[in-house]
Each structure stands twice: as C-alpha cells, then as structure tokens.
C-alpha cells in the first residue's frame, strides 16, 4: 500500500438515467469509486462496473476507475437487490456495501437484516457503507422496529463505522446543515438522507456535498464526495 494514499468515493442517487450518462458528470472529480442509486442496468458489466436491481431502469451500481477493480462479494440468502456487497481491490483494498433502501422493504428497517447477514463482511477493518438510506434521526418515530439512530449505533458499536459527514463536521445526526436531497427538486424541501460510513479511526480529509444549483437539473439528490487518507501499515 502506498503511504498516505488518498481514496475518493462518491455516492449519488442519479434519479434514473444510464451509468454512462450520469458518470460523465462526476468524471472531473476523479473518483476512485462511485456508488450509484437509481441507474439503469448497463449492457455489459466488468471488473469496473457491477450493477444490481430488479428493475432494469433503476438499480444500484458500483463503478471503479484507474487501478481499482470491483468484485462481487458472496451474497447471503434473501439479500434485497438494492444492497450490493463488493470487494474493492487496488492500491487500497476494502469492503464496500452499496445501499439504496426501498419503501417496500420499510426503508431503514431493512438495514437490520443486512447487519445480521453480513456481520463478518462488515467487520473487515477497511469497510465503507455508502448510499441512499432514505433515513434520518428526525424520522425515528416512524420506524420503531429499527430506526436511523439504532442503525448509527449498530454501525459504531459493532463495526467501528461513523458517518463521514457528521464526523468531519462535528454534527449530530438530525442536526445536518447540508441536505443531500431536495424533495421534488424543491429548494425548500431539503433533507439529509445519503451517507458514507467509514472506519472511525480513518483520516477524513474532506467531505463535500454538491451545490443545489449545479445538480438540480440532473437529480433530486446531490452527490456526496468523501476523501480518505490511508497510511501504509
């Protein structure tokens, strides 16, 4: 591993469209890995592109660039199509769980099953869980079986994972200043529902959420970009 290697990951709910069409809007940021939600199934997949979903027009995808490749991790029985476990190989190797929670799986409540099914996978020392969770502490009362705050606590206690945005900015869940979605593309209906959970002891160099004006014509979500610094072991 290269000393002080910077790893850049972007998660973005692209609100439909092809991977090729949507990815070109992110290329200028030179991401090592992109986690997409709501993108169409590509004609071909490779070790740089993995897609999963039960609707060919809307799925979750992991795209790598440069020296990085993505390998599908073994699936546990009854894994929802919109959770995609991937092994990232390259200058930095890690486990990645791509997430897009769905209404028909009770949104954040479906994460409880993923935590149970993929406990060993998520316990890898270099693990990232990223995507559109459709959840926030402000809606905990709507999910009494398993709410956002429970998920955050589980990630912290069991897997040593924290939200990069909250850790970098010293902000509590539910007190976010930067929305990641503008419901119906309305600037007055902003919510923070997209997250990138990273190891608590990792060095978070930067966390950036796209500007509303720059992205409003492309999606109701804004990309969340995270830079992590990895030192050689």
Walk through the language-model features, giving the residues of each.
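Surface polyanion/phosphate-binding segment centered on an Asp-His-Pro turn
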Residues: 217-233
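Surface-exposed cleft-lining segments at the edges of enzyme active sites
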Residues: 97-111, 137-142
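Active-site environment of divalent metal-dependent phosphoester hydrolases
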Residues: 16-21, 39-44, 104-105, 136-138, ...
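Structured beta-strand-rich core segments of catalytic domains in phosphoester-bond hydrolases
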Residues: 37-106
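Metal-dependent phosphoesterases centered on the DNase I-like endonuclease/exonuclease/phosphatase
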Residues: 112-193
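N-terminal, active-site-proximal structural segment of metallo-dependent hydrolase catalytic domains
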Residues: 1-47, 57-60, 231-233
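Conserved beta strand-loop-helix elements of the APE1-like EEP
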Residues: 55-71, 88-89, 175, 182-205, ...
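Active-site metal-binding loops of divalent metal-dependent hydrolases
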Residues: 14, 39, 101, 133, ...
